[in-house]
Amino acid sequence: MDRGIVLIERKNEPFGWALPGGFVDYGESLESAAVREAREETSLEISNLRLLGCYSDPARDSRMHTISTVYIASGLGIPSAADDALNLGIFRPDSLPERLCFDHARILADYAAKYSTHHSGLLP
């Protein structure tokens, strides 16, 4: 797999590109939810989770007030769009798509400020 930032193109509104992610199921840890959501949306098995940050601006999602806990991870396998993902792309930090959903441009800017391009993948 190419090294880079894995993004999905959303099937549902709001449309655009986003970091893979979703909601935590009852009784599930944040880390387990990140692993499950990555598998469901990208077909990748992830490991080596490292916390990037938490994002809680009430305006980050127009549908409801959500809080995202964002992890950086290594992905294993052949990536393919699945579940809520229409498409999947692997991007370099300097060539991200223009239409990013939610506050993912801010999250990716935080990633770029903290890490060099040799790290692979971002997963909330």
Walk through the language-model features, giving the residues of each.
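Active-site segment of metal-dependent pyrophosphate-handling enzymes
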Residues: 43-78
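NUDIX/MutT-family hydrolases
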Residues: 70-72, 80-114
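Hydrophobic pocket-lining residues within nucleotide cofactor-binding pockets
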Residues: 24, 55, 75-76, 93-96
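N-terminal strand-loop-strand
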Residues: 1-19, 46, 50, 75
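The catalytic Nudix box helix
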Residues: 19-51, 71
